[in-house]
Swiss-Prot record:
Gene3D superfamilies: Aspartate Aminotransferase, domain 1, Type I PLP-dependent aspartate aminotransferase-like (Major domain)
UniProt-listed InterPro entries: 4pyrrol_synth_GluAld_NH2Trfase (IPR004639), Aminotrans_3 (IPR005814), Aminotrans_3_PPA_site (IPR049704), PyrdxlP-dep_Trfase (IPR015424), PyrdxlP-dep_Trfase_major (IPR015421), PyrdxlP-dep_Trfase_small (IPR015422)
Known EC number: 5.4.3.8
Quaternary structure annotation from Swiss-Prot or TrEMBL: Homodimer.
Protein name: Glutamate-1-semialdehyde 2,1-aminomutase
SUPFAM superfamilies: PLP-dependent transferases (SSF53383)
Length: 430
């Protein structure tokens, strides 16, 4: 496999785009590679400018549950496009989509549509602080909630502490109200409650940005109880897991009803769309009814809403969709683990519905510290081998993979066979 055109394209992009990419992970820096420049996608496959094709386990980082260029979704987008791209005014489609979202999630009365997961979490936190009338926020090490300043925070000295900025350009003042606790650790979390005047807690119930690390059920139930005890708003960030892990996101697995929730990715079917929502008494604090300001020129734009609505209609019609996707994810993760065992390579694998992850690690991964113990050098070697064998995996050991509806058992088995070849070559030093 050659990537000559992609190499040239990447060099050219670096001249006019900061870093050559519009989101850092796309640069393939952590796997020491060159990103293939994509020409098109269809179904489960990606096609690059060098005429290579790949089984795509990234699926645009999660939104494409029906794969690339789904004919029904594509047709509906084109029909909507003919009527206009954006109006800056209400449409019936927005209400229809909101009804579909609300109907799938317990405790969700109202939503507000936005353009990105970052906007959704940022707005949800502002709303939660207004409702609780308390400023401090608890987040968890390893969870990602977008790139707003108050959330680009890492733990300081100790696992339960007021955080420090994790990015240049973020003033300390932005992080002084953010406490960072250890994921899956209730003791660490309650320490944070005792240290600050906590108004809200935000968490990925199925974390997808330290690799795939699901919350333990007793932890999430305990977190809900702590929020009730300390009168804090619980925000579940389901931007990635919502409509992905199941029709009801994490609720299928945990049964936890949050005060607020954020969705994204699947609800936009590959176009920029996200939302936040929750109980009516909280949501009604939003302008124009209440005093919490939030707005967006392109929020609820008809193309994204049409795409998302088309995807949700397809999901709801297909009663066995999640069962099939889960079975394929299990087939893949079990196949990868068995292959690694044949070469005495430590590999931990897991899936939650159509989300899957794997760590080159001898032990189960329950939090960010565990994830950091994984062999990232081995991951980089494995990723490069798989890429050149036509299998497109997330280009970081701290990302999550995704199954899409067009995938078949034959595709999964082929990917496992390529993994076996890759492990063999790595062990032999080829």
């Amino acid at each position: 496999m050659e990537l000559l055109h992609s190499i040239n394209d990447f060099n050219e992009a670096k001249q006019v785009i900061a870093g050559g990419v519009n989101s850092p992970v796309r640069a393939f820096k952590s796997v020491k590679g060159t990103p293939p420049f994509i020409l098109k996608g269809k179904g489960a496959y990606l096609y690059d400018v060098d005429n290579n094709h790949y089984i795509d386990f990234v699926q645009s980082w999660g939104p494409l549950i029906f794969g690339h260029a789904d004919e029904e979704i594509e047709k509906n987008i084109i029909n909507t496009l003919k009527k206009g791209t954006s109006f800056g005014a209400p449409t019936e489609l927005e209400t229809t989509l909101a009804k579909e979202i609300v109907s799938c999630y317990e405790g969700l009365d109202k939503v507000r549509l936005v353009n990105s997961g970052t906007e959704a979490t940022m707005s949800a936190i502002r709303l939660a602080r207004a409702y609780s009338q308390k400023d401090d926020l608890i987040k968890f090490e390893g969870c990602y909630h977008g790139h707003s300043d108050s959330l680009l925070v890492k733990a300081g000295s100790g696992c339960a502490t007021f955080g420090s900025p994790s990015s240049l350009g973020v003033p300390n003042d932005f992080s002084k109200h953010t406490l960072v606790a250890r994921y899956n650790d209730l003791n660490s979390t309650e320490e944070c409650f005792k240290k600050g005047d906590v108004g809200c807690v935000i968490i990925e119930p199925i974390a997808g940005n330290m690799g795939l690390v699901p919350a333990q059920k007793e932890f999430l139930l305990g977190l809900k109880a702590l929020c009730e005890k300390y009168q804090a708003v619980l925000i579940l960030d389901e931007v990635m897991s919502g409509f992905r892990a199941s029709l009801s996101g994490s609720q299928e697995f945990y049964g936890v009803v949050p005060d607020l929730v954020t969705f994204g990715k699947v609800i936009g079917a590959g176009l920029p769309l996200a939302c936040f929502g929750g109980r009516a008494e909280i949501m009604d604090l939003l302008s124009p009814i209440g005093g919490v300001y939030q707005a967006g020129t392109l929020s609820g734009n008809p193309l994204a809403v049409c795409a998302g609505l088309s995807a949700l209609y397809k999901i709801k019609r297909d009663k066995t969709l999640y069962t099939r996707l889960n079975a394929l994810a299990v087939r893949l993760t079990q196949g990868l683990k068995k292959s690694a065992q044949n070469y005495n390579i430590a590999l931990e694998t897991l899936n939650m519905g159509s989300m899957f992850g794997f760590f080159f690690n001898e032990n189960a991964v329950c939090d960010f510290d565990d994830a950091l113990k994984s062999d990232t050098e081995m991951f980089a070697k494995f990723h490069q081998k798989m890429l050149f064998k036509g299998v497109y995996l997330a280009c970081s050991s701290f990302e999550t993979g995704f199954i899409c509806e067009p995938m078949t058992e034959e595709m999964i088995d082929l990917a496992v066979a390529k993994a076996d070849e890759s492990f063999d070559e790595i062990i032999k030093g080829v």
